Regions:
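Conserved alpha/beta core of the MobA/IspD/sugar-nucleotide pyrophosphorylase nucleotidyltransferase superfamily
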Residues: 13-16, 56-69, 216-297
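N-terminal glycine-rich phosphate-binding loop and ensuing alpha1 helix
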Residues: 9-13, 20, 27, 53-123
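A short, conserved structural fragment
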Residues: 42-51
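ATP-binding glycine-rich loop module of kinase domains
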Residues: 325-340
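Key DNA-contact positions within bacterial/archaeal DNA-binding proteins
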Residues: 32
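Conserved core of the sugar-phosphate nucleotidyltransferase
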Residues: 172-247
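Conserved beta-loop-beta/alpha segment of the NTase-like Rossmann-fold superfamily
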Residues: 126-196
Length: 340
């Protein structure tokens, strides 16, 4: 079953009355493609001529029903300078709600209550989640020297029918579902010239070519029952090798000229990855976390508003480093924090 057929089945599980035209709109492909794949599902015995799911289709959906989630929250988010020393990224607030609590709430809405949160930097700040949401915290003590491939390896026994979620995602609608069939990795429809990956018409994630720009990676993923086994084996194997210390977990997905799993393509207006101070300001200029003493010092010294401070970049890598470059009124500056 290909990725488009998987999406058709999941849509029909939620509403068997959907027409092919409605399916095309929901999935984001042409009516002709839906008609072709719909007929393929009929030929495969997964839906009837009348559009009903067969026992085989229902069995497939049941076997791959989401049952748990992993939230990656170990990193210290050095690109969030100057506020990354005060609070871990997952606890930044957007519209009065922390990022990680919104994700947990959205998971609960689709029946996912078994949630593992991999923590490292400022791990104590997340402990309230244990009593409030009954999550399990898993500690990655190597967060300062190794990337999130190693965080995911810590919970490799919990990949089966699991969502993998970065803690710095804000989605206007619920990105999770009660029903899944195939594994997927979330990509945005926004073109990104710096990305090496793009989504083709078959929803495959492939290396971009000279004719096509890449798509933005979002980072949320779903791993079904079938794919959990090989992903676990690859994670554990790569985590044992020092050359993968700086690798993202997505490196495990590569096979040949692209990812081994397909894409879930979303509108860029709906899902936001908050990597920087400016990302946070763009989505919620009233966020309490924007009230940084460092930004206030700059604004007062240059007699400008906070919004005129742009293109903030860390000066050098390092967990304790807070000095950064920034631009203001077409001039570049360095903000050096005393004591460094």
């Amino acid at each position: 079953m290909n990725d488009i057929q998987s999406k058709i089945l999941c849509n029909l599980k939620e509403n068997e009355l959907l027409s092919q035209r409605q399916l095309a709109k929901n999935i984001g492909v042409s009516l002709g493609i839906i008609n072709r794949e719909y007929n393929g599902l009929i030929s495969s015995g997964l839906i009837t001529e009348g559009g009903k799911l067969t026992k085989e289709a229902l069995k497939n959906i049941k076997n791959n029903k989401p049952k748990q989630a992993i939230i990656l929250a170990a990193g210290y988010g050095q690109r969030m300078v100057p506020i990354n020393m005060d609070k871990p990224k997952g606890l930044l607030t957007v519209y009065g709600e922390t990022l990680i609590e919104r994700l947990i709430r959205q998971l609960h809405e689709v029946g996912i209550t078994k949630i593992y949160v991999v923590v490292g930097y400022m791990k104590e700040a997340y402990e309230f989640l244990i009593d409030k949401y009954d999550v399990e915290l898993v500690i990655n003590r190597e967060y300062a020297t190794k990337n999130n491939l190693h965080s995911l390896a810590k919970v490799s026994n919990h990949l089966d029918c699991s969502y993998i979620v970065p803690c710095d995602i804000w989605s206007s609608s619920n990105p999770f579902s009660m029903y899944e069939c195939n594994s997927w990795y979330m990509m945005s429809d926004l073109s990104n010239p710096t990305s090496d990956l793009r989504v083709n018409k078959q929803f495959h994630i492939v290396l971009k070519d000279k004719r096509n720009e890449g798509n933005c990676s979002i980072g949320i993923s779903y791993i079904n029952h079938l794919d959990a086994k090989w992903l676990k084996e690859r994670l554990v194997s790569m985590a044992e090798k020092t050359r993968y210390d700086n690798s993202f977990w997505e490196d495990c997905l590569f096979e040949g000229e692209g990812y081994r799993i397909g894409a879930k393509l979303v509108r860029h207006e709906d899902v936001h990855e908050i990597n920087t101070y400016e990302d946070l300001r763009d989505i919620d200029e009233e966020s309490e976390n924007l009230k940084s003493d460092t930004i206030t010092v700059i604004a007062n010294a240059l007699h400008v508003s906070n919004s005129e401070i742009k293109n903030i970049q860390i000066l050098k890598k390092g967990m304790t480093n807070r000095s950064f470059l920034f631009e203001c009124q077409n001039q570049r500056y360095i903000m050096r924090i005393p004591g460094e």
